[in-house]
Amino acid sequence: MNSNIEKSDKPSFIKISEQPSLYDDLEKKSVREILEDINKEDQKVAIAVQKAIPQIEKLVTQIVPRMKQGGRIFYMGAGTSGRLGVLDASEIPPTFGMPPTLIIGLIAGGDTALRNPVENAEDNTIRGWEELTEHNINDKDTVIGIAASGTTPYVIGAMHAAREHGILTGCITSNPNSPMAAEADIPIEMIVGPEYVTGSSRMKSGTGQKMILNMITTSVMIQLGRVKGNKMVNMQLSNRKLVDRGTRMIIEELGLEYDKAKALLLMHGSVKKAIDAYKAG
């Protein structure tokens, strides 16, 4: 496999996400008109995500049993897509009290690319798989590629190698029948249409990607027992706001006075452990 893929001026499929905007002469519009136009387009995103729910469900139901056996999720993307994967992965430890090694976001160009573009990083077809092997990836894990275009070589190369090694692959893309979807066991195609600013996939595509990532990780964590009722009982107590929130969860569950509930929480380090310990006597 070549380390860099050659770019072609003749795409093999139509990139809906890069078609001309439905709006023109943007620079002549008032601020209010621009905001209302963007909001109008954003309303299409939730509908596109709703249509993708059957595929999202298929992916989640395949992920959960793997994670119960010690599997992990790897997000892979470049640019905005990569940053969103890293963002979602980084929220799992504080929200659900899980180790940061459980859901891992990888971005073309590494951590430097979180803030600054790294030239040609997304065109490397082998680096993604190299990064996965550095994490000792195995067949209990899941690789989810994220790319609005569905053509990012860094992602496609990693997914292709993952499938060859019997690893479950999924993807999130804004175009149908993309090369990336062809490498996914379960592709999620979220067709949001052309962007307000032509080709600016950080807009509707990015919004939809974030929504789907939220849906995947939240539903997986609920299935893994990290939520009780509707509460984040395993959240990390990383600041006073969260200590207060956890204390009030305990009050609601056990009917204790505030100070006693807070002391119980701080003693055990999590809402769930505090409640379980109190009920156990």
Swiss-Prot record:
CDD domains: SIS_Etherase (cd05007). The keyword Ion transport does not apply. It catalyses: N-acetyl-D-muramate 6-phosphate + H2O = N-acetyl-D-glucosamine 6-phosphate + (R)-lactate. It comes from the Bacteria. Residues 63-226 form the SIS domain. Pathway: Amino-sugar metabolism; N-acetylmuramate degradation. InterPro entries: Etherase_MurQ (IPR005488), Glucokinase_regulatory_CS (IPR005486), MURQ/GCKR (IPR040190), SIS_dom (IPR001347), SIS_dom_sf (IPR046348). It is an enzyme of class 4 (lyase). One of its GO terms (molecular function) is carbohydrate derivative binding. Its EC number is 4.2.1.126. Transmembrane segments: none annotated. The active site is at E91, E122. Keywords: Carbohydrate metabolism, Lyase. The keyword DNA repair does not apply. One of its GO terms (biological process) is N-acetylmuramic acid catabolic process. Homodimer. A lyase-type mechanism (elimination/hydration) is suggested for the cleavage of the lactyl ether bond of MurNAc 6-phosphate, with the formation of an alpha,beta-unsaturated aldehyde intermediate with (E)-stereochemistry, followed by the syn addition of water to give product. NCBIfam families: N-acetylmuramic acid 6-phosphate etherase, PRK05441.1, PRK12570.1. Specifically catalyzes the cleavage of the D-lactyl ether substituent of MurNAc 6-phosphate, producing GlcNAc 6-phosphate and D-lactate. Belongs to the GCKR-like family. MurNAc-6-P etherase subfamily. This is N-acetylmuramic acid 6-phosphate etherase. It comes from Bacteroides fragilis (strain YCH46).
